Amino acid sequence: MPTSSAVYTTFAGQIRNKTISKGGFTFCLAEYLHPALRDIEKMPEDTFDQIVDKYVEMNVAHPFMEGNGRSTRIWLDLILKKRLGKCIDWSKITKNDYLNAMIISHTKSDRIKELLASALTDKINDRETFMKGIDYSYYYEQED
C-alpha cells in the first residue's frame, strides 16, 4: 500500500481527471471540469455576494482529488482581501454550521453568505487570524 505522501505526490496540485463524489453529492463531472473552471474564473468578484457565489461554484467544481475545502477557503480569503479588504475569522464559525451551509449552498447560498458575513473581519494582516484560519480549515475536514 502506498504511503500518503506517495499518493499525494501523484496528484497534489493537479486538476483531477476522475469524477468524484462525497456524501451522495457528485461534484462537477471530470469531462466538464476545465470549461467549468474557465467559467468560474470569469465570474465577477466585485461584491461580497459575487465572491461567495464564486466560492460556492468552486466548491461544486471541486477541482482536486484532495484538499478542495482547505484550498478554497484560503482562496476565498485571498479574494476577499484583494477585493474588499476583508477576510473570514474562521474561529467564529462552527464546523457543524459551516458544513451544513456548504451542503445546501449549491441550491441555496443564503445560509453560507449569512454565516461568512457574520465572521468578516478587517484583520487582513493579522498573522494570528490567518494561522487560526488554517487550523480551523483542517478542523472542518476532520472526521468526528
Language model features with spans:
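FIC/Doc superfamily catalytic core
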Residues: 1-144
